[in-house]
């Protein structure tokens, strides 16, 4: 059976399904909303959306290769035909991340309708993978009953993240209607400072005792595992103090009667609830942990941070550093490029561009100061862009390395002299190579290509090459030292990277250039 026949068979099977009632496990309040959203007028809109989706998918190679793949048009078709049971079946088979991506393709209203039709556990898993923008749209449309239901199904750390961005009144209502255990756990997490380890952790983990055997540990995992964030690492706790950790691998490879205290690792690395999230993520990266234990200031074990949350932190921090280095104001509310509004993009970019535009005044002042040199030696002007661009590129190279090194802990402000010594040597080599190549280029170009048009070509080659040599050294030193100085002073090294370095290096390179030109061509100037 070829691909086209498979597609026709799948379509025919769906066509043969009868119209189905809304699933019985959907609350009455939500059923009423769904009935309103699935009236005849709404169905016509759904048909239009489905036809547009089919046109887009007609040229999609992945869809052609997988006729049974769940697509936007197929999802809408099931909705139009009121085949709710089938819709639940096909969405259950999808990976949560893939289902979340598919839901985000739907418009806001259709996304809400489909989400309300999903099974609770399927909806909750997909919800965790959605973008902040899509999640906010759903949350804003939820009733309190739906919101409480979602919170109860979510892992506690994800639920706390969601509630952090909501108005205080809504949070209060939701917590009042939540179960006592959920309410107490969420209140604790919400009280930790933002960006601290406490706000990132979850208290849902597998708890073991030292006096247990491996067989008893497996029984404990079976009981606690459903609600635990991870079962790959279990924690041995006595009187709320962490005594050790034991991996699932160790349990599986041990005899059932083996005591836990014989196979647990008591050399435990922990972080405090007040530690910065980025520090925690770096520690997890350093030790290759999939989960990091968290203790309070008294040393009591309070929860764990899992690798998925650590990756999110590192991604956010990396994005923020890149934005700052590109002279863009970071925005916590921004999502993807297309998910961010035109106004937000402009608002992020304008402030730094204004600052840099005004700071370029210094470069203009330098140029004005040496105006006489342009009149006497107009050829000097043609080399200015190359000189400033090369110096700026050199500065950006080392500043990028320094910002990355500082972020990863590979370089510290105390390494100032070591970095200085290394960059002097590196920049001397780079400057010498660039200077020699450029000097040869200028001499050959203006001797043969522009033969007879310019005098003292050798002088120009010397001026530009020597200027380039010293400009490269200057740029490398400025680019390397500024981020270190910023870190030492408590400022963000990324801010001191590309934006300021380019301005400083441009002005200094021009001063060097014209001073060297004056020395070489002092009679002509």
Regions found by a protein language model. Give the residues of each.
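Alpha-helical transmembrane segments in multi-pass membrane proteins
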Residues: 96, 352-360, 383, 387, ...
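Non-transmembrane, extramembrane segments of multi-pass ion/lipid transporters
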Residues: 309-345, 396-421
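Membrane-interface segments at loop-to-transmembrane junctions
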Residues: 339-348, 412-427, 462, 488-504
């Amino acid at each position: 059976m070829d691909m086209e026949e498979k597609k026709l068979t799948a379509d025919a099977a769906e066509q043969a399904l009868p119209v189905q009632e809304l699933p019985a496990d959907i609350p009455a309040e939500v059923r009423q909303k769904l009935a309103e959203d699935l009236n005849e007028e709404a169905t016509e809109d759904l048909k239009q959306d489905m036809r547009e989706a089919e046109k887009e998918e007609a040229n999609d190679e992945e869809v052609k290769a997988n006729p049974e793949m769940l697509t936007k048009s197929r999802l809408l078709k099931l909705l139009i035909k009121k085949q709710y049971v089938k819709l639940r079946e096909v969405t259950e088979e999808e990976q949560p991340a893939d289902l979340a991506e598919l839901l985000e393709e739907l418009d806001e209203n259709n996304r809400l309708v489909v989400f309300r039709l999903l099974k609770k556990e399927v909806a909750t898993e997909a919800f965790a993978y959605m973008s902040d923008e899509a999640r906010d749209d759903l949350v804003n449309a939820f009733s309190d009953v739906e919101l409480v239901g979602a919170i109860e199904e979510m892992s506690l750390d994800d639920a706390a993240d969601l509630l952090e961005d909501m108005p205080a009144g809504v949070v209060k209502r939701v917590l009042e209607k939540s179960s006592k255990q959920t309410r107490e756990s969420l209140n604790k997490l919400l009280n930790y400072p933002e960006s601290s380890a406490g706000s990132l952790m979850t208290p849902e983990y597998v708890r073991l005792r030292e006096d247990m055997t491996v067989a008893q540990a497996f029984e404990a995992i079976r009981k606690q595992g459903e609600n635990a964030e991870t079962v790959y690492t279990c924690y041995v706790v006595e009187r709320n103090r962490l005594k050790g950790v034991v991996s699932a691998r160790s349990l599986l490879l041990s005899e059932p009667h083996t005591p836990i205290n014989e196979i647990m690792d008591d050399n435990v690395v922990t972080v405090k609830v007040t530690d910065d999230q980025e520090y925690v993520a770096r520690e997890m990266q350093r030790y290759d942990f999939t989960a990091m234990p968290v203790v309070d200031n008294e040393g009591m074990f309070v929860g764990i941070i899992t690798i998925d949350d650590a990756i999110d932190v590192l991604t956010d921090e990396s994005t923020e550093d890149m934005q700052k280095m590109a002279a863009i104001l970071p925005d916590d509310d921004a999502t993807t490029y297309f998910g961010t509004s035109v106004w937000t993009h402009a608002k992020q970019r304008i402030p730094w561009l204004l600052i840099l535009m005004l700071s370029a005044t210094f470069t203009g002042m330098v140029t004005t100061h040496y105006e006489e040199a342009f009149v006497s030696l107009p050829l000097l002007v043609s080399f200015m862009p190359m000189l400033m661009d090369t110096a700026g590129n050199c500065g950006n190279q080392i500043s990028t390395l320094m910002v990355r090194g500082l972020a990863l802990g590979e370089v510290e402000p105390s390494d100032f002299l070591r970095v200085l010594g290394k960059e002097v040597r590196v920049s001397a080599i780079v400057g010498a190579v660039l200077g020699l190549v450029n000097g040869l280029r200028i001499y050959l170009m203006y001797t043969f290509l522009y033969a007879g048009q310019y005098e003292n070509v050798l002088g120009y080659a010397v001026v530009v090459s020597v200027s380039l040599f010293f400009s490269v050294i200057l740029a490398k030193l400025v680019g390397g030292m500024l981020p270190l100085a910023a870190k030492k002073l408590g400022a963000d090294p990324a801010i001191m990277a590309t934006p300021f370095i380019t301005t400083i290096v441009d002005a200094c390179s021009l001063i060097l250039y014209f001073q060297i030109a004056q020395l070489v061509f002092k009679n002509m100037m």
